[in-house]
Curated annotation (Swiss-Prot):
Protein name: Light-independent protochlorophyllide reductase subunit N
Keyword match Plastid: no
Role according to the record: Component of the dark-operative protochlorophyllide reductase (DPOR) that uses Mg-ATP and reduced ferredoxin to reduce ring D of protochlorophyllide (Pchlide) to form chlorophyllide a (Chlide). This reaction is light-independent. The NB-protein (BchN-BchB) is the catalytic component of the complex.
Gene name of this polypeptide: bchN
Entry's cofactor comment: Binds 1 [4Fe-4S] cluster per heterodimer. The cluster is bound at the heterodimer interface by residues from both subunits.
Cofactor(s) listed: [4Fe-4S] cluster
Domain of life: Bacteria
Length: 428
């Protein structure tokens, strides 16, 4: 059976030169991952040990008021804590005791480090061990850092999941583990496709509830659904699990190759694969074709933001007819992103890390049709006449798998259509 996909390029970007940037960054910190994780993990609570700035960021980004009692909060470090005039550990213990007595539904508590807690060297790992012993087994306490000193944007989820992996039960069962947080409707689509292929049992990390936590062992194979999970990938590998490498499921091609890699691992016949995927593939291809009319022939520049950039560049160049000038990403994990880089034709600059002033200079020099960047850069670039796309939308919007492929292309087409309308109106 032929997958009826375009042939790979003669030379991809996996083994090409990478421009290493180590300057000023313009990205959100890892605390932002809490915004989608607290919705996914329904018996978890994320307690940020940080400042009022951390609290304002989370409240604003989540779009909820604190009296709504979301599954996150901030233990505020006051001036006396920062000055070493108070026992921050004792105060943290009291806050946790108060929280758990008020919220008996909590089964997983995450102590999340921030810039202030990192600066005063508050040992949240030891605090988590102490509090787990005190409140277990009903509540397990984890810790990870979302500090802007240590992490960028999507690394918060990676650090969170990596903190869970060592505590997962051991198993000898042959299971597929899907790793990465997805909106429930998208996760259901993925599981439905895999189940229709006859693949199972299928487990998910993160689980909705602590009691549903997957096991892991030498017969576990795992597929990542997000490309920013390098630390989690390493933690699972150390537990004996094996990674199924594949392009990420963005667009029709990426989804098909992701599913095919898993299907091959589980011995699914070509005929069965065609039977299950033919209809959703056709829908995805039609939806992408409609949305990509605006994108064909346009040039693209990615600022580093989420680590989705190489996978999205592959989708936009191969399925939407765009050309990439530069593909920037905060970190480049070739073991994870290699299959996508193989399909990204040689040509664009691949940059890792950020030196924002130099990258802005390169945008001005190359004048791309579309620039994908963070919120803080978008308005200044728009004021200079560049068309921009907010990178954060690509994380908070459902964009994975067949049914969202057209929406994904549409996210990039929308700012170009808006710019064209504004130009027509200005000409009139």
């Amino acid at each position: 059976m032929s997958l009826d996909l375009p042939p790979p390029p003669a030379r991809g970007c996996r083994n090409g030169d990478v421009l290493k940037e180590r300057g000023q960054r313009e990205v959100f910190c890892g605390l932002t991952g809490i915004i989608w994780l607290h919705r996914k993990m329904q018996d978890a609570f994320f307690l940020v040990v940080g400042s009022r700035t951390c609290a304002h960021l989370l409240q604003s980004a989540a779009g909820v008021m604190i009296f709504a009692e979301p599954r996150f909060g901030t233990a505020i470090l006051e001036e006396k804590d920062l000055a070493g005039l108070a026992d921050a550990n004792a105060e943290l213990d009291r806050e946790v005791e108060r929280l758990l007595s008020r919220r008996p539904d909590i089964r997983q508590l995450f102590l999340v480090g921030s810039c202030p807690s990192e600066v005063i060297k508050l040992d949240l790992h030891r605090a988590a061990e102490r509090l787990s012993a005190q409140h277990g087994p009903a509540v397990r306490v984890y810790n990870f850092t979302g500090s802007g000193i240590e992490t960028t944007f999507t690394q918060g989820e990676d650090a969170c999941l990596a903190s869970i992996v060592p505590t997962l039960p051991a198993t000898e069962a042959r299971e597929l583990l899907l790793v990465g947080a997805l909106p429930d409707v998208v996760e259901d689509q993925a599981v439905s496709l895999l189940t229709a292929l006859g693949i199972g049992p299928i487990r998910v990390l993160p689980a909705h509830h602590a009691a549903e936590a997957p096991g892991v062992g030498p017969n576990t194979v795992f597929a990542l659904v997000q490309p920013f999970l390098g630390e989690t990938h390493g933690a699972l590998t150390r537990r004996g699990a094996r990674h199924i490498a594949a392009p990420f499921p963005f667009g029709e091609e990426g989804t098909t190759l992701w599913l095919k890699a898993i299907a091959d691992e589980f011995g699914v016949s070509p005929a069965k694969f065609e039977e299950v995927t033919a209809a959703p593939r056709a829908r995805a291809r039609k939806a992408v074709a409609a949305a990509s009319e605006t994108l064909k022939g346009k040039s693209l520049f990615f600022f580093p933001d989420s680590q989705l950039e190489p996978s999205l560049a592959r989708f936009l160049t191969r399925e939407c007819g765009m050309s990439a000038i530069e593909v920037g990403t905060p970190f480049l994990h070739r073991g994870i992103l290699g299959p996508d880089l193989d399909l990204l034709a040689e040509g664009p600059v691949i940059s890792e890390g950020q030196d924002v002033e130099r990258q802005i200079d390169r945008v001005r020099a190359t004048n791309p049709d579309l620039t994908v960047c963070g919120l803080g850069l978008a308005n200044p670039l728009e004021a200079e006449g560049f068309t921009t796309k907010w990178a954060i939308e690509l994380v908070f919007t459902p964009v994975h798998f067949y049914e969202q492929a057209g929406d994904l292309a549409g996210l990039f087409a929308r700012p170009l259509r808006r710019r064209a309308i504004l130009r027509r109106e200005a000409a009139e």
